[in-house]
């Protein structure tokens, strides 16, 4: 039997139980106190008759309870399904139904959606962020393999939300490979857990590395405001900040409000979106810390490549492959290309999923002969450093989140007043890009941009909603900024 995550986590945290492990709202929890919370969560789930192979959806922010429930579910041989609780209601329901969960657990910040979810036949319960609630009456959900640790929902290589099931071995291999690749992570480090854990990158870099290595973490429900977060980093001697470029931009912006440097911070880990090259220089000059950039996908347990430590940073490059990943660059015929040549990036390895969860059509399309088609155009230099050239799919990156133009266009085109629509990304310094829609109305029809935006808000996640709508007589044949 392969080693499971909860075994390693429990063994490491049980050593030196009085050592600090988790800081939440200015209070440090010891390893022992956190394990006691895990035990309480496990007892509640046993009382709820939760069975091995079943799944529980967590609609929770980063918090002690989200971490403890995750470990408790694993201890009972179950699967965690983190859901973006900020997403559109219709998307939440689709994901919960698709995953066939035993129950959903959320918090007071989302108490308005709990009864709506329950009305769809999925029991939804409210918990505090520091203690488990009462036993829950789950549904007779499908029981599957206990090997699946987490099921993430991602836009991935198409605009439609789909599920990626990652096993314990997938996540353990990427966690250990990241630690090995960076080379200087020790028990003296303190991580900032501020990236949303319903995202694979946040889950691995913010939570899992800390849990597996028993590294102290400062857990934040929200990264905002950035100035407050920076002060928390200083006060708690945080050494590593996992982030997306939007978060880095916000920190740099807050620096104009008079941020003092912190001597404890070693570096910022950046992923989830392309990092503007000037950020590296500005971060060193203004905040006094380097940025270690990487590349990854949910299908590869969030990380494929990383700069090999501070000395291995090469501006414009996305580091070298982790030891758990193999890759090849291929042309349109499938022929493997040498270093320096651009082509489609394929990957495989211990950290790469074997399929899309309950989606045989997409599995057949993107998982071919043991390799995963990333749909990214890339190249490696002679030293093995990765560069992304472009994407084979039309993707807009908003604050580290993928937005597919076709998905937004489909929602807008459903309105009877709309004849044609084209959606693009418009560059913005903070979010990377924002969504803009060009719309041709049918003759004699009228609708305002405000009305269309309100329609989009009801059907799309917040980051997919167009910020700009321009009515035109004819669609542009090229991108207009």
Short names for language-model regions:
Residues 2, 18-20, 135-153, 159-160, ...:
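Conserved pre-ATP/AMP-binding loop-to-beta segment of ANL
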Residues 18-63, 67-71, 88-93, 169:
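Conserved AMP-binding/adenylate-forming core of the ANL superfamily
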Residues 30-32, 149-176:
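Conserved AMP-binding A3 loop
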Residues 45-48, 71, 75-142, 443-445, ...:
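Structural core segment of the AMP-binding/adenylate-forming
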Residues 87, 349, 354-355, 377-464, ...:
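AMP-binding/adenylate-forming catalytic core of the ANL superfamily
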Residues 172-190, 200-240, 254:
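Conserved AMP-binding/adenylation subdomain of ANL enzymes
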Residues 238-243, 252-313, 326:
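Gly/Ser/Thr-rich phosphate-binding loop
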Residues 320-324, 335-366, 403:
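Conserved ATP/PPi-binding loop(s) of AMP-dependent carboxylate-activating enzymes
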């Amino acid at each position: 039997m392969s080693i499971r995550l909860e075994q390693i986590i429990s063994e490491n945290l049980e050593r030196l139980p009085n050592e600090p492990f988790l800081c939440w709202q200015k209070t440090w929890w010891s390893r022992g106190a956190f394990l006691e919370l895990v035990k309480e969560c496990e007892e509640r789930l046993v009382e709820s008759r939760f069975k091995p192979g079943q799944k529980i959806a967590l609609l929770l922010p980063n918090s002690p309870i989200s971490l403890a429930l995750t470990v408790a579910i694993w201890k009972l041989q179950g699967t965690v399904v983190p859901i973006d609780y900020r997403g559109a209601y219709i998307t939440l329901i689709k994901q919960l139904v698709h995953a066939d969960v035993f129950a959903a657990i959320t918090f007071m910040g989302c108490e308005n959606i709990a009864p709506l979810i329950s009305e769809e036949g999925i029991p939804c319960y409210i918990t505090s962020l520091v203690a488990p609630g009462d036993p829950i009456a789950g549904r007779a959900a499908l029981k599957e393999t206990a090997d699946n640790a987490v099921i993430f929902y991602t836009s991935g290589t198409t605009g439609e939300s789909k599920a990626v099931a990652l096993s314990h071995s997938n996540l353990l291999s990427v966690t250990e490979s990241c630690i090995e690749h960076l080379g200087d992570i020790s028990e003296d480090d303190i991580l900032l857990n501020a990236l949303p854990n319903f995202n694979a990158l946040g889950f691995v870099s913010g939570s899992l590395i800390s849990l597996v290595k028993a590294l102290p973490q400062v857990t934040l429900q929200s990264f905002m405001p950035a100035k407050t977060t920076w002060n928390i980093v200083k006060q708690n001697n945080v050494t590593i900040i996992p982030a997306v470029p939007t978060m880095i931009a916000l920190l740099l912006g807050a620096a104009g409000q008079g941020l003092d440097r912190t001597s404890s911070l070693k570096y910022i880990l950046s992923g989830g979106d392309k990092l503007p090259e000037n950020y590296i220089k500005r971060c060193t000059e203004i905040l006094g810390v380097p940025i270690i950039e990487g590349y990854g996908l949910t299908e590869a347990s969030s990380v494929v490549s990383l700069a090999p430590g501070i000395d291995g940073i090469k501006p414009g490059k996305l580091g070298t492959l982790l030891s758990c990943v193999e890759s090849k660059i291929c042309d349109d015929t499938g022929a493997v290309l040498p270093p320096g040549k651009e082509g489609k990036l394929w990957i495989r390895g211990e950290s790469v999923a074997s399929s899309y969860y309950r989606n045989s059509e997409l599995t057949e399309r993107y998982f071919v002969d043991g390799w995963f088609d990333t749909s990214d155009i890339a190249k490696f230099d002679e030293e093995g450093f990765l560069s992304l050239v472009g994407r084979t799919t039309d993707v807009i990156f908003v604050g580290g989140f993928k937005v597919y133009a076709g998905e937004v266009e489909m929602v807008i085109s459903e309105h009877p007043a709309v004849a044609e629509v084209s959606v693009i990304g418009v560059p913005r310094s903070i979010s990377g890009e924002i969504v803009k829609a060009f719309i041709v109305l049918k003759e004699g029809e009228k609708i305002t941009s405000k009305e269309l935006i309100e329609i989009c808000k009801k059907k799309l996640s917040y980051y997919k909603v167009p910020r700009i709508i321009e009515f035109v007589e004819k669609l542009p044949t090229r991108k207009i900024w």
